[in-house]
């Protein structure tokens, strides 16, 4: 049944240190993502002084980071390995959100958001590639579904928490997101230790 297959995916995920850690990182990163992005339109208006057109330009500028991230992810992983590429990307996510929480300059905010999206693309590509190499082919769909559930729960939690924090200070969700990503970077260094890339290639 569907539930039995889902349970099998969860059990396998929980029993594998690296893939389970990637799922945990994905859930936490989803919280960190939704903390600022659940209130980004309000942040852009109240903190950056942007109207609807300006907000659109801000998002368009941030998308450039995604293009850059897709271009550099594979070379970075080949040079640094999955562990340090993922950790560095998550650290960049933390730094970009910390800067965004402090700035009131729309141009600086656009650059920081582009760096944030760059981190998200690099982290996602590396994590997905590593997971696909480590999970047996017959379990890939079930384990992937279990990981997506963890991420969806993180999105829901981050959205609710972001809205609650914004009622006291509009920049607070962004700062909280930076803290979450800093924790994710530290967790990645610890949890992905060992020859994870050689294990994936085996």
Residue ranges and their predicted role:
Residues 1-2:
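Conserved aromatic/hydrophobic "specificity hotspots" at molecular recognition or selectivity sites
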Residues 7, 14, 22, 28, ...:
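C-terminal transmembrane bundle of multi-pass solute transporters/carriers
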């Amino acid at each position: 049944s569907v539930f039995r297959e889902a349970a099998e995916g969860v059990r396998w995920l929980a029993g594998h240190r690296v893939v389970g850690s990637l799922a945990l990182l994905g859930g936490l990163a989803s919280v960190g993502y939704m903390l600022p992005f659940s209130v980004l339109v309000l942040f852009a208006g109240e903190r950056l002084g942007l109207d609807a057109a300006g907000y659109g330009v801000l998002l368009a500028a941030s998308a450039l980071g995604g293009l850059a991230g897709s271009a550099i992810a594979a070379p970075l992983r080949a040079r640094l390995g999955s562990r340090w590429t993922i950790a560095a990307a998550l650290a960049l996510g933390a730094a970009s959100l910390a800067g965004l929480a402090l700035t009131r300059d729309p141009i600086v905010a656009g650059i920081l958001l582009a760096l944030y999206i760059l981190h998200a693309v690099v982290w996602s590509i590396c994590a997905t590639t590593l997971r696909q190499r480590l999970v047996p082919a017959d379990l890939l769909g079930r384990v992937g579904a279990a990981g997506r559930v963890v991420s969806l729960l993180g999105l829901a939690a981050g959205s609710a928490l972001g809205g609650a924090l914004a009622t006291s200070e509009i920049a607070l969700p962004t700062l909280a997101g930076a803290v979450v990503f800093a924790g994710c970077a530290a967790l990645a260094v610890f949890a992905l230790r060992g020859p994870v890339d050689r294990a994936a290639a085996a």
